[in-house]
Amino acid sequence: MFLFLVAFPFDLWIKSSFYLYLAETLARFIFVVFLLMYNHFKKLVTIPICHFNKTDLLLLPLLPILFCNFYYLLEMRNGFQITLDETFFIQIIFQISVALSEELLFRSLIQNCLSLKKTLTRIFVSSLIFALFHLTYFFSSFNLISLFVPLYTFGLGFLLGFVYEWSEKNFLYICGYHFLFNLINQVLYTYMLNVGEDYLFYVNAVCVGAFGAIYLIFLLFLSKRVNKSFQR
């Protein structure tokens, strides 16, 4: 159902960018309501909205990853231009619907319901499903560059899955992180900043990804000592 929703060709009937984003946003919010009702009646999982533990402060160094594309702009100096259009605010609301729908499905439901004992195995499998889902971008455009999307979404999915388990299934954390990542790296960067991408763009992406991977490995070593979600 979710694949149908995401791949549905709204653009065949809706030519206005504003109304296209509006239709996709409404469709995702309807899907969120459906998932919440389905979970309520089936009693699959409990979804904690927000709580805080002192160990959550160790997640703060992961925040710089949110700005990964903007580090590239620091190298460009004055080589970019900010442009706003009428779709700006609807894109923000759309990214909220993306974060809610994808985190509810892939983390709260799929990752929670996987019948796997080890926490890291559940994170890995849910991240793989999350990455394969993003192959829809390739099948909708048949652009070879879109084949790289599942690679970075696997890394993002693993990070979100780790944060989800570390924070004891804090839904607000993963939704907030996912929303800000998309807002900063897609809306503000891709849609608002007219920049070209040269080799420095990819060098920057690799460096930021390497930092995130190293810090996650560090947290993995700590996890069995300070976090009960990983003590199995």
Regions found by a protein language model. Name each.
Residues H40-I47, I217-R232:
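Membrane-interface capping segments at transmembrane-helix boundaries
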Residues F148-V208:
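Functionally important transmembrane alpha-helices
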Residues S101-S127, F162-N170:
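Membrane-interface helix/loop boundary segments of multi-pass membrane proteins
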Residues L5-K15, F70-Q81, H134-S140, V187-N194:
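Juxtamembrane "helix-exit" motif on the non-cytosolic side of transmembrane helices
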